[in-house]
Amino acid sequence: MKDKLDFYINGQWVQSESSETIEVINPANENIIGHVSAGTKEDINKAVIAASDAFQTFQYSSKDDRIELLNNIVSEYENRYQDFVDTITEEMGSPIWLSSAAQAKTGIKNINE
C-alpha cells in the first residue's frame, strides 16, 4: 500500500494542515492501494502563493533555461517511466499494456510537442 500524505509546495515536501485522508481504490479489483491527504483550503492557499511567487521570477527566465528545464523533466520522466505505468495501472485499473503503450506516454508527448 502506498500512502502519499505530503504536498510538494515551494520546492519542498510539506505536511497537510489536516490529518484527513482519502482512500485510493483500484477500480479493477476494488482494493485499497493507498491513501492521499485530503488537503485543506490553507494547503491550497500555500500552493497558490508559492506558484504566484515562482512566476514572478520564472517569467523572466530565458528560452534556453526553459528548454533545459523541460529536457530535465523529460529525462526524469523517462527514467521513472515504469513507475508511471505501474501507478496508472493501479489507480485507473487499466491493463499494463495500455498504461505503457498509451497513457504513460501522454506526459512526454505533451512536452515534446
Regions found by a protein language model. Give the residues of each.
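N-terminal Rossmann-like NAD(P)+-binding subdomain of aldehyde/semialdehyde dehydrogenases
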Residues: 1-113
